[in-house]
């Protein structure tokens, strides 16, 4: 029964792991719901501030903010939003694949790359595979604050205003639904006009201070809000991916336990049959 003992030990070990993955799945479900609430709460602000920017730009058409001016791209910047922890399936791997593809397309055109990395997994990736990381931040926790991001975002915005980079994009996972998380690369600056944006929002307001001064401040707030939205949405995507990964691990553990239990029963049955045969053989010899 030595084989049976080993199988019993494996079954006990897998059951212990199954309890852990099941608990992690339940925790991920709870965290995902909270992250979804934060995501839904911050989304209207990000959308509204863009509408205000569009109106301010129309209110002062002779002034073109640097964040709205297209220029030849010699150097591009990326703000990469990754997770701090693993055990979330292929979430980070898929994100890095999308990022590397976009970076390679730029490099083929002679464009150099600067990176701002949010999250430990992104920092580890670029430490291993290389990349010009000019700013990094990690361990934002389950409830990230926009104030935690301002410093890193400012590094990239200052680089854009100084002409050291000519385009800035944010790379993150979009939360589509519980089962789907989509890696995306979105351009932040220069600001890309949305179709019919100017036609939908015509407000007759007087601004104090003037529209130009407000626009200068709001453009920075807009970029910060977009990065914050990306972080919150990536967090929701991370928890959803972890929930699915832990559910799959729990289910696979159950299947493996069933298989091992069957093998154990067969081994035990074979041992009993052998013992009976030996007893019968001994009795016949007597």
Curated annotation (Swiss-Prot):
One GO BP: proton motive force-driven plasma membrane ATP synthesis
Transmembrane segments annotated in the record for this chain: none
SUPFAM superfamilies hit by this protein: ATP synthase (F1-ATPase), gamma subunit
GO cellular component labels: plasma membrane; proton-transporting ATP synthase complex
This protein's UniProt keywords: ATP synthesis, Cell inner membrane, Cell membrane, CF(1), Hydrogen ion transport, Ion transport, Membrane, Transport
A GO molecular-function descriptor: proton-transporting ATP synthase activity, rotational mechanism
Family affiliation: Belongs to the ATPase gamma chain family.
Location within or outside the cell: Cell inner membrane
Keyword Transmembrane helix attributed: no
Organism encoding this protein: Pseudomonas entomophila (strain L48)
Taxonomy of the source species: Bacteria, Pseudomonadati, Pseudomonadota, Gammaproteobacteria, Pseudomonadales
Gene3D superfamilies: 3.40.1380.10, ATP synthase, gamma subunit, helix hairpin domain (1.10.287.80)
Cross-referenced InterPro entries: ATP_synth_F1_ATPase_gsu (IPR035968), ATP_synth_F1_gsu (IPR000131), ATP_synth_F1_gsu_CS (IPR023632)
Domain of life: Bacteria
Subunit structure: F-type ATPases have 2 components, CF(1) - the catalytic core - and CF(0) - the membrane proton channel. CF(1) has five subunits: alpha(3), beta(3), gamma(1), delta(1), epsilon(1). CF(0) has three main subunits: a, b and c.
Name of the protein in its database record: ATP synthase gamma chain
Role this protein plays: Produces ATP from ADP in the presence of a proton gradient across the membrane. The gamma chain is believed to be important in regulating ATPase activity and the flow of protons through the CF(0) complex.
CDD domains tied to this protein: F1-ATPase_gamma
A UniProt-annotated Pfam family: ATP-synt
